[in-house]
Amino acid sequence: MSFLCGSASTSNKPIERKIVILGDGACGKTSLLNVFTRGYFPEVYEPTVFENYIHDIFVDSKHITLSLWDTAGQEEFDRLRSLSYSDTQCIMLCFSIDSRDSLENVQNKWVGEITDHCEGVKLVLVALKCDLRNNENESNAITPNNIQQDNSVSNDNGNNINSTSNGKNLISYEEGLAMAKKIGALRYLECSAKLNKGVNEAFTEAARVALTAGPVATEVKSDSGSSCTIM
């Protein structure tokens, strides 16, 4: 039996990628993960301290095994949450459209924490609870936006999307997109876990972004002094 470093066939082996889901407490991260991985929406809010999900998807004919790390957004879990960042290829940074604090914390809190623990990691900004917008044109806006290639904002009918709060101070699509550009996110997505709208699309786009990051490599030296990169 012989081994050739880096030459083994991996055609049947899934590509492994790690994605951390980050954002304020109660913004909807766990509900998003439950709908995507288990197919159900939890009606009762239960704060998450830490949970890891493994889920297989196919993106652009590639079999990907996603390691999805749910994190607690509360300040008292800052030290524990910091353990989640190692070997991360993409972060889904979330906010809720009914909480301006959660949007402001994207820049004021989370980007700084990300820089401290995994500077340079690829970011995807995700707006949650978009079912709270009951305007038909707004609900049609639950689609991914590739920030680097398409800065236009339109609905399925080709019309400009006008933010509407129906008496509530809901965050508009345009405000979310502006924040995504400000923090250098590669994608801006909107979804509703409750209605299961845009959920699969959000994780598909995050997986695409994670693929561009490449695998985390560890260099191991042999007795002869030569090195081999283990993916």
From Swiss-Prot:
UniProtKB keywords: Cell membrane, GTP-binding, Lipoprotein, Membrane, Methylation, Nucleotide-binding, Prenylation
Cysteine methyl ester PTM positions: C228
Subcellular location: Cell membrane
Pfam families: Ras
GO molecular function per UniProt: GTP binding; GTPase activity; protein kinase binding
Pro-peptide region(s): 229-231
Chain intervals with Low complexity compositional bias: 151-165
Motif window: Effector region: 45-53
Keyword Cytoplasm listed: no
Residue sites binding GTP per the record: 23-30, 70-74, 128-131
Xref: PROSITE patterns: RHO (PS51420)
Region annotation (Disordered) ranges: 139-165
UniProt activity-regulation remark: Activity is positively regulated by the GTPase activating protein (GAP) RGD1.
Positions of disulphide bridges: none
Listed Polar residues bias regions: 139-150
GO biological process: actin filament organization; establishment or maintenance of actin cytoskeleton polarity; positive regulation of exocytosis; positive regulation of formin-nucleated actin cable assembly; regulation of actin cytoskeleton organization; signal transduction; small GTPase-mediated signal transduction
A GO-annotated cellular component: plasma membrane
Main function: Plays an important role in cell growth. Required to keep the uninucleated state. Modulates morphogenesis during bud growth via directing organization of the actin cytoskeleton and the position of the secretory machinery for exocytosis.
Protein family per UniProt: Belongs to the small GTPase superfamily. Rho family.
Record text on subunit structure and interactions: Interacts with TOS7.
NCBIfam families xref list: small_GTP (TIGR00231)
Leftover remarks: Present with 5910 molecules/cell in log phase SD medium.
Protein name, as recorded: GTP-binding protein RHO3
